[in-house]
Structure formats: C-alpha cells, structure tokens
C-alpha cells in the first residue's frame, strides 16, 4: 500500500496564493491592511520562533503584524490591560496570545479577555462553545487547520471512528468537537486512559495531540488507517511513531510539514476573515 502524504506545506502554499489576492483586493478597496497583533510574554526561544513565523506568514500574503513583547515579570493585570488596549484598537483585526505564558499569569483569564471578533486563534471559551454548537466562530487554529487539510485531500470523516489522543483546551478538546460536527464517532483518550493501545487499534482516523514524542506506537495502528500527527519534538518526530507506518496506512501527515504549516495558515486565514468583516 502506498500511503497518501497529507502535505500541509503544499496546501498552505496554495492557500497563501489565494489569500494574497484577497488581501490585495481589500487594500485597494478600503485602503486598509489587516493586522494580526501577537503578544509574547517572556523570552522563551521556541515561543519567539513561533511568533516570528506567524509574522512572516502575514507578510507573505501582504498583511501586517504587530509584535508585542512583554517581560517575564508581567502580571495578569498588566497583560489584561494590553489585551483590552488591542481589543479597542480599530486597526487590529486579530489578537494572538502566545502559549505558554509565565506561571504567575492567569492564562485562561487572559485568553477569555480577547474580544470574540478578534479571537482568530480560537482560544476563548465563548469561541469554543459557539464552534461546538455550529455557530459562527473562529476555530482553534491547529484543529481547524487539520480539518482543512483533510478536506483538501477529500478525506471523508462521516461515520468514521476517530480516536483523539490528548485533551488540551486548544487542541484535543476542539479537535474532538470538530470531528463530532463532521459526523464522525469520536473517542477521546488522555494520560489517565486505561489500555490506550486497545482504543488506538480501533481507530479509522488517529489524531496524536498529546505532546509526548512517539507515545503512540506504530503497532497500535491498524492497516489502512488515516494518521494525523499534531506533535513536534526535537529531532523532527511527532507524537506518533510514523516510520514503520508509511507502507501500510491509507494516509498520514508528515512531521514536519504536515499539521504545523496548516496551523499558521489557518491563523492567517482567520485574521483575514476578521479583517473582511471589520472593514466591510
């Protein structure tokens, strides 16, 4: 069996070409440029790299980014003040608070302070609830990117048994709800799940979203399954042991180059959508 490679890098590039045309049209029509504001608290090197990548993606499609860097000592109140300032800035169309924040900051409180119409990373409780009820909302960027990638390759989810390993509020939980909304039958597993291999073996579609390198072993996954790996760890490995799978599954996302590019691409797409709504 030759597995289909779900190439997120290629899909993101093709989408960027369309987004660039839409941004150009919007700028010509309104004289305004969509802006994504990114907030980085502290000096975590990985977080700084991710923020830089998001700014670069904005520029590739003709959008602007506003990079806000706050010191490690920032308090919850100070961060809330900055978020409220951005909420009230009509020139800003999307707000991203880079995860994680320092321990003294109430991350959930700060996420939920982001105005719903600027929550382009899909991190607020309100946004999650609206998405879950199939109401208009911006989806969490990584699971929404996964859904877009599967759709780009005509992967049908209706009636499939999807096993999501991981339950984080910005990945596992919204991923499960999006799959449920696509009429899949969903099983959620996590660190307290008993007999994890037995659940994984039942999956038509397996989503690794647990944040532990190669926790999900190749011999747990049945032939012909669709494998989505949302993890990335040093050495270019994900949450799933991909190597032995490539000649016996139906499709898989490579690591890197699968889910990651679609996460950033979805953030840019949703920022443009927000700009279109706000600028008219």
Curated annotation (Swiss-Prot):
Keyword Transcription: no
InterPro entries the record matches: Aminoacid_DH-like_N_sf, NAD(P)-bd_dom_sf, THF_DH/CycHdrlase, THF_DH/CycHdrlase_cat_dom, THF_DH/CycHdrlase_CS, THF_DH/CycHdrlase_NAD-bd_dom
Residues noted as binding NADP(+) in the record, renumbered to the chain: 166-168, 191
Enzyme Commission identifier(s): 1.5.1.5, 3.5.4.9
Keywords associated with the record: Amino-acid biosynthesis, Histidine biosynthesis, Hydrolase, Methionine biosynthesis, Multifunctional enzyme, NADP, One-carbon metabolism, Oxidoreductase, Purine biosynthesis
Signal peptide boundaries: none
GO MF annotations, alphabetized: methenyltetrahydrofolate cyclohydrolase activity; methylenetetrahydrofolate dehydrogenase (NADP+) activity
Catalytic activity, reaction form: (6R)-5,10-methylene-5,6,7,8-tetrahydrofolate + NADP(+) = (6R)-5,10-methenyltetrahydrofolate + NADPH; (6R)-5,10-methenyltetrahydrofolate + H2O = (6R)-10-formyltetrahydrofolate + H(+)
Pathway field: One-carbon metabolism; tetrahydrofolate interconversion
GO aspect biological process, one term: purine nucleotide biosynthetic process
Any Pfam family the entry gives: THF_DHG_CYH_C
Subunit field text: Homodimer.
Family recorded in the similarity comment: Belongs to the tetrahydrofolate dehydrogenase/cyclohydrolase family.
Listed HAMAP family: THF_DHG_CYH (MF_01576)
Function comment: Catalyzes the oxidation of 5,10-methylenetetrahydrofolate to 5,10-methenyltetrahydrofolate and then the hydrolysis of 5,10-methenyltetrahydrofolate to 10-formyltetrahydrofolate.
Protein name: Bifunctional protein FolD
Organism: Marinomonas sp. (strain MWYL1)
């Amino acid at each position: 069996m030759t597995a289909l490679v779900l190439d997120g890098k290629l899909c993101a590039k093709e989408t960027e070409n369309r987004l660039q045309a839409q941004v150009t049209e919007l700028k010509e029509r309104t004289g305004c440029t969509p802006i994504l504001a990114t907030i980085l608290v502290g000096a975590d090197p990985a977080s700084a790299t991710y923020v830089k990548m998001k700014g670069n993606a904005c520029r590739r499609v003709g959008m602007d980014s506003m990079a806000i860097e706050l010191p490690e000592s920032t308090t919850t109140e100070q961060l809330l003040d900055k978020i409220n300032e951005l909420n009230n800035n009509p020139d800003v169309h999307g707000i991203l608070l880079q995860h994680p924040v320092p321990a003294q900051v109430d991350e959930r409180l700060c996420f939920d302070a982001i105005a719903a119409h600027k929550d382009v990373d899909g991190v607020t409780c309100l946004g999650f609830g609206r998405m879950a009820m199939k109401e208009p909302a911006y989806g969490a960027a990584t699971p929404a990117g996964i859904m877009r990638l599967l759709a780009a390759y005509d992967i049908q989810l209706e009636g499939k048994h999807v096993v999501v390993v991981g339950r984080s509020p910005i990945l596992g939980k919204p991923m499960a709800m999006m799959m449920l909304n696509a009429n899949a039958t969903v099983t959620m597993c996590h660190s307290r799940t008993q007999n994890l291999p037995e659940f994984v073996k039942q999956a038509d579609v397996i989503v690794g979203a647990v944040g532990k390198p190669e926790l999900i072993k190749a011999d747990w996954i049945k032939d012909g399954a669709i494998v989505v790996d949302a993890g990335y760890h040093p050495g270019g490995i994900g949450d799933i042991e991909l190597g032995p799978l490539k000649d016996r599954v139906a499709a898989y996302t490579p690591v890197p180059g699968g889910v990651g590019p679609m996460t950033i691409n979805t953030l840019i797409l949703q920022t443009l959508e927000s700009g279109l709504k706000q600028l008219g």
